[in-house]
Amino acid sequence: MEIFKIPSFEIVNLELLKCVASFQKPIILSTGAATYEEIDKAIEVILGEGNGDLALMACTLSYHTENEDPNLKRIQTLKERYPNFMVGMSDHTMPDENMVIPAISVALGARIIEKHYTMSRTMTGSGHFFSLEPRDVAKMVKNIRLFETVLGDGVQGVAANEVRARKGGRKSIVANSFIKKGTVITKDMLTYKRPGDGISPDRVNELIGKIVQLDIKEDFQIKWEDLNE
């Protein structure tokens, strides 16, 4: 796949952006040290060529970047300000043992991760010392995949793996003491005990005033079929 990657230094080179956009190929634009006004103008120029296939990269223009400086929350800021474009992270921090920063970036919404790469950080040259070595890339990908897995879909509800614990850990309404047939139920006759496979405590008020149709022993669950009006 042919993609143009525009470094942060060129975000104000509007003639370059115009030319690149005219090829109608996807563009990845880094935004390090750029103001919102500069980003807006760059986007305007690119869109002006009819090219909307654009991704914006959060970036700190510092080689290397200290761990306190990436400001990863910018990923969320860019996503909120520019909802029509994919957002990624261009990361210049030093590789750590578990490659945490790229994974956190993904957790915050980054869809693209850019890191410098080298065969060895001992090689001479300005960018090698903070670049990823092959083993680092493997760790980074593994950690990112783990983060993607644990993030889930964000839907709140009862997951399949929670059903057993939900049933066993929650409580049901039971008789606080022996309840004789024909008794009108009052609140003091009831208490809550595990497991949660009976009537849920949040329905206790529905039981008050109902008449017991049979004897219910202490600690036995109250069942709807044992009651009448």
Where does each model-flagged region fall?
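Catalytic cores and adjacent flexible loops of soluble metabolic enzymes
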Residues: 1-229
